Amino acid sequence: MTHPYHPQCGCATRRHMLGWAALASIGAITGLTGLTGCSQADNSSAQSLKPVEIDGATSCDLDGMLLADYPGPKAQVRFAGQDKPSFFCDTVELFATLLAGEQVRAAQAVYVQDMGQADWNAPKGHWIDAKTAVYVVGGKRHGSMGPTIGSFAQEADAKKFAGEYGGKVLRFTEITPAMVDLSGGALHDTRM
């Protein structure tokens, strides 16, 4: 049996990436609660947790896609004991990873791009704390893998986006595993 692949890059479809996400053993969302306990002594550690800008060679940790080649918000996570961030070419992949029950590594910092400031078609910079961001789930704008979750620093920007492209405005803790299921369903266009 052959596996369906994305025609442009040859990567596995979202259906197969769910397995990759589980195998990646990337941090549990509960690990994010430790972010608020930083002290002055942890200042040098906090400096190393700042977001890293992507370049033409930055690839997604789940599927190897080059982040700079695709539209929509990107994400990065700093896991405990990790020198470099894990990058995601899509916010749906980020949330699917963080919300997966199999995840065991603690996420020390999570960043998404502020699409109220970044260019949707070629986002650069504008990294914000994912826990304080405002999201639009169910909108019509596509990211690297089809419909994605818009991320914004300001609620007004998220509401404007939802008014123009549809979707529901939610906070980080309101996004559920069912909203980011990589195995298929209404969220995904399997005809890609």
Where are these regions (language model features)?
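N-terminal secretory signal peptides
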Residues: 1-34
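Bacterial signal peptide processing site
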Residues: 39-41
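Mid-length scaffold segments of soluble, non-membrane domains
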Residues: 84-126
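Short cysteine-rich clusters marking metal-coordination/redox-active sites
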Residues: 60
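Thiol/selenol-based redox catalytic cores and closely related redox-interacting motifs
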Residues: 108-159, 165-172
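Short functional micro-motifs and their immediate structural scaffolds
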Residues: 43, 68
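Cys/His-coordinated zinc-binding microdomains
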Residues: 64
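Short metal-coordination and nucleic-acid-contact micro-motifs, chiefly zinc-binding Cys/His arrays
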Residues: 56
